[in-house]
């Protein structure tokens, strides 16, 4: 990564703290439930409607830790815009926004990249904490993006 500073939003999924580029996040909303859609792909928890936009919800806990059962009652949704359209990422907690120098980003070791391929793009030490930088474009695989478009759940939101 370049030497310039990057603003990241920190959030918790399970016991780990992850970060996303703040520019990828359009809005943060409380999770009050989602509507299940019978034709939706299995990786979509449901949909919400936000300002007349239908937004598919992906539970990052399920994506990152399929066997973890414990739930957070006060989950939040990070509304993000991706090449597949707007997607809501359900997380356990949003913590804060941090500025990180570009030279602080470290490549993940090969064994750790196994969190579904290229989803984890950097390890970011910051003070006493270690953040895991995920790529919002890779939350869904290429096949899942096609499946999502075919289900027509995000396509209407790609031009916003």
Residue ranges and their predicted role:
Residues 1-160:
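An acidic, low-aromatic, low-complexity terminal/linker signal
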